[in-house]
Amino acid sequence: MPKSEIRKLLQEIKKQVDNPGNSSTTEIKKMASEAGIDEQTAEEIYHLLTEFYQAVEEHGGIEKYMHSNISWLKIELELLSACYQIAILEDMKVLDISEMLSLNDLRIFPKTPSQLQNTYYKLKKELIQVEDIPKNKPGRKRKTQKNTKKEKTNIFGKVVPAEFKAPASIKEQISYDKSREKNLVDLLSGVKSNVQLLSENQGEENNVYDLLKSIYSLSSLAVQKEELDKKYQDLQTKCQELEQENSYLKQQNETMTDSFHTLVLQVADFAYASDLDQIQALPLFSQQLVVTLNQLGVFKENYKQM
């Protein structure tokens, strides 16, 4: 089933939840049946979405819920799992599903595509349970810490030492361990320090310029690589489509060749038969000839225009 059909079904479910009526489930089942989806699955999503919106109202409405200390409601996670499953069964990609369900499109969930996608994978890998998840509660359980003293961490989750000795000079500051270069913050800090060091020396403006120019050139190359990768993927997709089309045309050509060969044999058998055999075989020959001509795309309605 095309992606558009899944989208239309979910859009209709949301519409019926927003404006409930006596025939809501009937309309949803009808649309699901026409699209080839299990009616019970569609009805289940309808009830889950209804319960989710009711739970949101109990928390004071969508705005208060989004700014509350609740990251995910249990019913919301159940709905999330059901929506992904129904779309994945119809060969939709997780990325497209996340975009469709998010605030960017159908607005079924008050979440961004990345929030939906990350949570779906956590559910799939059983990193989180189907339960109410507070914002201050991580998906994985933390080990019990004997030391109750709060430790400072950077944005990468690494512990920062409580006591930090300021470097005596800029040269000391940029002499950090190369094994830490994978840390983006350290890299940017090192670049900044190098620029400051070069700027301290008089007459080194060209060195600063060359450094920044090199950084710009490298970043430009990275952007170009992303664009080339995308073009390469597009070309691969196009190549696959052409290969499929070529395979189809090849198969059609083989079929046409076989049909033409059959037609020649039928005409030859009839032409070289005796007069008596021709008279007796004429009705069967005519029927066989029509079948073979149809296989070649020649019909009574179009043969005069060919």
Swiss-Prot record:
InterPro entries for the chain: MogR_DNA-bd (IPR021009), MogR_DNA-bd_sf (IPR038245)
The keyword Repressor appears for this protein: yes
Pfam families the UniProt entry points to: MogR_DNAbind (PF12181)
GO molecular function, one term: DNA-binding transcription repressor activity
One cellular component term from this protein's GO annotations in UniProt: cytoplasm
Disulphide bridges: none
Keyword annotations: Cytoplasm, DNA-binding, Repressor, Transcription, Transcription regulation, Virulence
Protein location: Cytoplasm
A single BP term in Gene Ontology: negative regulation of DNA-templated transcription
Predominant subcellular localization, coarse grouping: cytoplasm
Free-text function comment from the UniProt entry: Transcriptional repressor of flagellar motility genes, such as flaA, during extracellular growth at 37 degrees Celsius and during intracellular infection. Binds directly to the gene promoter region and probably prevents RNA polymerase binding. At low temperatures, MogR repression activity is modulated by the DegU response regulator in an unknown mechanism. Required for full virulence.
Name by which UniProt lists this protein: Motility gene repressor MogR
